[in-house]
Amino acid sequence: MRIVVAGIGPGSREDITPAVMQAVSESDVVVGYKYYFQFIEPYLSSKAVCVDSGMRKERERALEAFNYAMEGLNVCVISS
């Protein structure tokens, strides 16, 4: 189990680093603000669970990430 917090950059797929691409592709669960998923979609595993939410839900997303990690899953929290 692990939690990776990955910054996706200022808002373009071209700004996403190889390390973030790898973290996303290796994750069982990806948690983040729903708008950000459009930038990482090509890197998601077909088996990944995506947990998205709206603005100002940072605490809820953090709790979701910890809950999934406590189940033994690899979690990536995407941020900008």
Regions found by a protein language model. Give the residues of each.
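Class I S-adenosyl-L-methionine
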Residues: 1-80
